[in-house]
Amino acid sequence: LSSSSAASDVYKRQTIFVPERMIVSVVCEEADYQAVEAQIAFLLKNLYPSKKIVKERSLPELHLEKKNEGFMDASQVQYVARAGNYVRHGFSYHGALRILKVIMGYDYLWINVRVKGGAYGCMNSYMRNGDTYFVSYRDPNLKKTDEIYDGIPQYLADFKADEREMTKYIIGTISDMDTPMNPSAKGARSMTAYLQGLAFADIQKERDQVIGATDEDIRGLKDLIASVLEEKNLCVIGNEDNLKSQSDMFMQLKNLYE
């Protein structure tokens, strides 16, 4: 290392590993906490001295770039992903998205991507910060799966479920939310809530929205999902010949193992 880069490295360490930046998550019996607290105090003493420059924790500004990449390999299947962010388009998180995940996973995506399409599986997720994705894995298709994703808004516009069907979806959603957790999992959940700035009221609101959801709430997600898909963010890992034959779907193709 040059002297300037070495000095920069030291400066970074001295501004990162300071008491103000330390977060500790402890999961233990109350009787054991005193011993843990002593270890935390010891660690604090061995960090770099405070420079009094830490005002608040914030993420660095990220400059996102749409690439629509296809990564080619020798496999005979694809992993097809579409992603986007609904918050960027003015939408907010709603507990009905929890139910949508169940509906997609056991109905629309499962039937079209897994059963009819022959993929090994499929996933979907809707995060509080707006990040959303739809993914297939070990999928013999590419463009067909992408078109299935594009069909989600129309599926939602036409969605109908009677009280019995909605109750089934709600029970499936709540069972996922109420999965039994060991102490470690509870600690991880609490840490995540702290880092995300989630209060108990936020979690209760989500639960109330799930329990009180109707098929109208599911139909109401159409525009939110459409906003994500309209971003046309695509990433695929799959067979070289398949990707090259459908290269118009991508902005760039790369060998996966380069």
Predicted regions located by residue number:
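His/Glu-based metal-binding/catalytic segments typifying zinc-dependent metallopeptidases
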Residues: 14, 21, 25, 30, ...
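Single conserved hydrophobic/aromatic residue that forms the stacking wall/gate
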Residues: 1-7, 11
